[in-house]
């Protein structure tokens, strides 16, 4: 009887662990993102990157998105139930959408989202990937829209999927 109780308890523990949501842990990234504001330049020293997957807001098509930040956003990302929430947790950093079309869509924010810039970039000119799978993106990204009053970004990253959304 005691062995049965231990077996059932062990099976229950395995089931609980299997059903628990995976942690949306940060992967390491490095580099800088710069954005011009009226008060002067905003510089974000990137330390963390997260890869999320889910439906694009415009098309509904499943896309991959990289979220670059200096702060650890793991807890906030874990609490998100949608892709729009995941994008919205960035207060100083950048999101980059993959698979939404022939260009990369990106959004850069600084000073607690008070300063924003969005644009598109040609992957063949700005992106060098060393890994490109459904569950992992690695490489470097160099965007320079500074001459147009926009953002510049020069980051290296290696990101495994942190979270997948259905909405």
Residue ranges of model-derived segments:
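A short, sequence-level motif marking secondary-structure junctions
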Residues: 47-53
């Amino acid at each position: 009887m005691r062995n049965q109780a231990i077996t059932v308890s062990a099976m229950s523990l395995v089931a609980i662990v299997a059903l628990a949501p995976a942690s949306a842990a940060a992967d390491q990234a490095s580099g800088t993102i710069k954005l011009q504001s009226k008060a002067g330049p905003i510089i974000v020293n990137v330390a963390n990157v997260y890869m999320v997957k889910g439906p694009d807001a415009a098309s509904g098509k499943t896309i991959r998105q990289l979220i670059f930040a200096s702060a650890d956003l793991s807890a906030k990302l874990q609490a998100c139930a949608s892709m729009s929430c995941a994008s919205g947790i960035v207060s100083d950093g950048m999101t980059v959408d993959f698979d939404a079309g022939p260009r990369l869509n990106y959004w850069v924010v600084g000073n607690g989202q008070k300063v924003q810039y969005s644009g598109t970039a040609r992957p063949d000119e700005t992106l060098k990937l060393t890994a490109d799978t459904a569950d992992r993106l690695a490489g470097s990204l160099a965007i320079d829209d500074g001459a147009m009053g926009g953002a510049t970004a020069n980051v290296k990253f290696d990101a495994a999927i942190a979270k997948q959304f259905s909405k």
